[in-house]
A protein has these predicted regions:
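Conserved NTPase motor "head" modules and their coupling/switch loops across ABC/AAA+ ATPases, GTPases
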Residues: 1-32, 174-304, 313, 317-333, ...
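Walker B catalytic acidic pair
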Residues: 308-310
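Helix-to-loop junction immediately C-terminal to a conserved catalytic motif
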Residues: 45
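Conserved lysine of the Walker
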Residues: 37
C-alpha cells in the first residue's frame, strides 16, 4: 500500500494555508476553474519529484505577495508512514526532507515516491519535438534506476561544459586539446551508459505501450514505436569526431543522446502528421498507463496516479474503462480533478468502490 494521506500547503500557488486529509484511495477534487485543483495535484507531484510538474522556476509556485512556500505531506507505505517536506526559503533556497532528515542531493529522493501524472498539456508528448519524449523517458527511468539518473545529471553537466568550451574556442579560434579530450571522454562514457540503458528499457517498454494502445483505441491501427538514436549505428566517439568542425561553428554539441527520440509511425507515416485527436489521446494514455504498469511491477506497489481534467479529454465510455482499470485492477491511489461534482460522483459510483470528494 502506498498513498498520500495528508497534505498541508502554506503560501503555495493560490493557497494561503490549507490542510487536506485523504481518507480513501479514490479521491475526486472538484471546483470551478482557478480554484486550485491543479495546484493541489502539483503539490503532491512536488513531494514525489522535488519540483513542479510544470517547467517553471520554484519561485513561480509562491503565492502572490509571499516570500516562500511550504508543502508537507504524510505518505502511507505498507504499515508505516513517512513525512515529506518541501520548503522554498525567502532567499530562493529550496530544502527537502524526509522524516525530518534533509537531503544533501535532491536526486536521492527520486523513485522513493513513484508517481504518474496525466494533464491537459501532456499532448505535447505526441505533437511537439523530441525533448518532450526524452523528458518522459528520463522521468520514468530515473524512478526505476538511480544510477541512470546520476549518469544523466553528469552527462548534462559535461555537455554544458563542452558547449561552453566550443563557444570559447570558436570565438578565439584557439583551444586546449587536452581539455577537449577530457570532455570528450567523459561525454562518451556517460552517453554510452545512457544509450545502453535506454535501449534495454525501451525494448521492453515500447511493446507495453503498444499493447495499451491496442486495448484503448477503438480502431484497427498499424502503430509502430521505435527508439531513434544517432548512437544506434555509429559509435559516439566517431560521431563527435565527424561533427567537431560543425559543433565548433555552431558553438554547441550537435550529436549524442541529448538528440534521442521515439520514432512513432501510424501505417508507416509519422504519427503526429496523420493521427486524429482521438488517436493522439489514445497514444498519450497508452504511454502513461504503460509507465504506471512499469512502475507498479518494478516497485512491487502501484504509483500514485494524478489525473488532471481528464474528463474533458475522454468520452464517458473511455473514462469508465480508465477508472475501472486503475481503481478495480490495482490498489493505486488516484486523484482526479473536474469542474463538475456530479460527473465525478456518477463515475465513481459506477465502478463501485469507496471514494472521497473534496470541493474547493
Amino acid at each position: 500500500m502506498f498513498a498520500c494521506r495528508q497534505l498541508t500547503l502554506t503560501h503555495f500557488r493560490n493557497y494561503s494555508f490549507q490542510r487536506f486529509d485523504f481518507t480513501q484511495n479514490i479521491i475526486g477534487i472538484f471546483g470551478r476553474n482557478g480554484s486550485g485543483k491543479t495546484n493541489l495535484l502539483d503539490a503532491v507531484y512536488y513531494l514525489c519529484f522535488t519540483k513542479s510538474s510544470f517547467s517553471r522556476p520554484d519561485v513561480q509556485s509562491v503565492k502572490n505577495g509571499c516570500a516562500g512556500f511550504r508543502i508537507e505531506g504524510t505518505f502511507q507505505k505498507n504499515d508505516g508512514s513517512e513525512k515529506v517536506v518541501c520548503i522554498l526559503r525567502e532567499n530562493g533556497r529550496k530544502e527537502f526532507s524526509i522524516n525530518e532528515t534533509s537531503y544533501q542531493r535532491f536526486s536521492d529522493h527520486i523513485g522513493k515516491f513513484p508517481c504518474v501524472m496525466i494533464a491537459p498539456d501532456d499532448v505535447t508528448l505526441i505533437t511537439e519535438g523530441s525533448e518532450e519524449r526524452r523528458k518522459f523517458i528520463d522521468t520514468l527511468l530515473s524512478q526505476l534506476q538511480h544510477d541512470y539518473l546520476e549518469q544523466l545529471i553528469g552527462y548534462n553537466k559535461v555537455l554544458q561544459q563542452r558547449n561552453s568550451f566550443l563557444k570559447f574556442a570558436s570565438e578565439r579560434n584557439d583551444w586546449d586539446e587536452s581539455l577537449l579530450d577530457i570532455l570528450k571522454k567523459q561525454l562518451i562514457e556517460k552517453g554510452d551508459f545512457i544509450h545502453r540503458r535506454r535501449l534495454a528499457f525501451l525494448n521492453i517498454f515500447l511493446p507495453e505501450v503498444l499493447q495499451q494502445y491496442i486495448s484503448i483505441a477503438s480502431h484497427d491501427d498499424m502503430l509502430e514505436l521505435k527508439y531513434d538514436s544517432q548512437l544506434m549505428n555509429v559509435p559516439f566517439e566517431e560521431l563527435l569526431q565527424q561533427n567537431f568542425q560543425r559543433d565548433l561553428y555552431l558553438q554547441r554539441t550537435g550529436c549524442g543522446v541529448h538528440k534521442d527520440d521515439l520514432d512513432i509511425r501510424l501505417n508507416e507515416t509519422p504519427f503526429k502528421n496523420v493521427a486524429s485527436q482521438g488517436q493522439r489521446k489514445s497514444l498519450l494514455f497508452a504511454m502513461k498507463l504503460a509507465a504506471f504498469e512499469t512502475l507498479k511491477e518494478n516497485k512491487g506497489f502501484p504509483p500514485i496516479l494524478l489525473l488532471d481534467d481528464v474528463f474533458e479529454k475522454l468520452d464517458e465510455e473511455r473514462m469508465h474503462n480508465l477508472l475501472e482499470y486503475v481503481c478495480l485492477n490495482t490498489s493505486a491511489q488516484v486523484f482526479i480533478t473536474d469542474t463538475h461534482e456530479e460527473r465525478l460522483q456518477q463515475a465513481f459510483m459506477k465502478i463501485g468502490k469507496d471514494f472521497q470528494l473534496i470541493g474547493l
